[in-house]
Regions:
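Structural detector for helix-capping/boundary residues
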Residues: 19-22, 53, 111, 135, ...
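Proline-centric
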Residues: 10, 114-125, 138-139, 143, ...
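Non-catalytic DNA-recognition/assembly elements of restriction-modification systems
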Residues: 7-32, 164
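A short glycine-rich beta-alpha junction/loop motif
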Residues: 5, 40-42, 90, 106-114, ...
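Sequence-specific dsDNA recognition surfaces
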Residues: 22-39, 53-83, 103
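A short beta-sheet element
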Residues: 51-52, 67-135
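Amphipathic alpha-helical coiled-coil/heptad-repeat segments
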Residues: 1-14, 165-215
Length: 215
């Protein structure tokens, strides 16, 4: 509701503005001749190598990333990743999105991932992250597929993606703040649930094997 304009926050007014994602963004990905061989995937190295399988719940699972050496990192500055960047999968399971906010070392992209950077003040990357997670973008992908499965998202496809955004960055940031706080609450609850599940599993092992007897 918040990213579609159907519900407005108090204190904001004015019609939402229609923009085109591609016209207001720099969209980059690893090009074919820069392709990596599996031998170049390192367990430790200079830079993270972000692949589509590293996306988890809107973030990147850094613990699951491979690495590449310095030469591969500096080869293409266009796909060097920074905090505040937006990533979008374009191969395999297309349309997965991640917002980068906890990067603590150099990172670059493997094939199959776009980095999306705003080049105008039409939108903030964090607001666009929530748009791309919403039904707005899912409906767009569904229209692209025309009912069939699509296995690749091209840059030319994103040229067709028009959307409506709040007219000010202040409203975008206010919406983002609410959604981020909700995500944080969900994350904390999931962590607590995971902890309790592990405790339960441990108790089951003890109780069901007779290692611990009830008094």
């Amino acid at each position: 509701m918040l990213v579609t304009g159907k519900k407005r926050l108090d204190g904001f007014s004015g019609d939402w503005v229609k923009i085109n994602l591609a016209k207001n963004s720099k969209l980059k990905a690893r090009i074919g001749w820069q392709g990596l061989t599996t031998a170049e995937y390192l367990d430790e190295g200079y830079s993270y190598l972000i692949t589509g399988t590293d996306f988890k719940d809107g973030r990147i699972n850094w613990n699951g990333c491979h690495y590449v050496n310095y030469d591969r990192y500096v080869q293409d500055p266009n796909i060097q990743v920074s905090n505040g960047d937006l990533l979008l999968t374009k191969d395999g399971t297309i349309g997965k999105v991640a917002y980068i906010s906890d990067l603590n070392r150099p990172a670059t992209l493997n094939s199959g991932v776009f980095v999306v950077k705003p080049i105008t003040d039409a939108y903030t990357a964090h607001f666009m992250f929530y748009v791309l997670k919403s039904s707005v973008f899912k409906d767009f992908l569904q229209q692209l597929s025309a009912g069939s499965t699509i296995n690749h998202l091209y840059q030319k496809d994103l040229v067709k993606f028009d959307l409506y955004v709040p007219p000010t960055t202040e409203e975008q940031e206010a919406i983002t703040g609410i959604l981020f706080d909700m995500d944080l609450d969900i994350y904390k609850l999931e962590e607590k649930l995971s902890k309790y599940q592990k405790i339960k599993q441990g108790m089951m092992e003890e109780l069901l094997t007779g290692k611990v007897r009830l008094v």
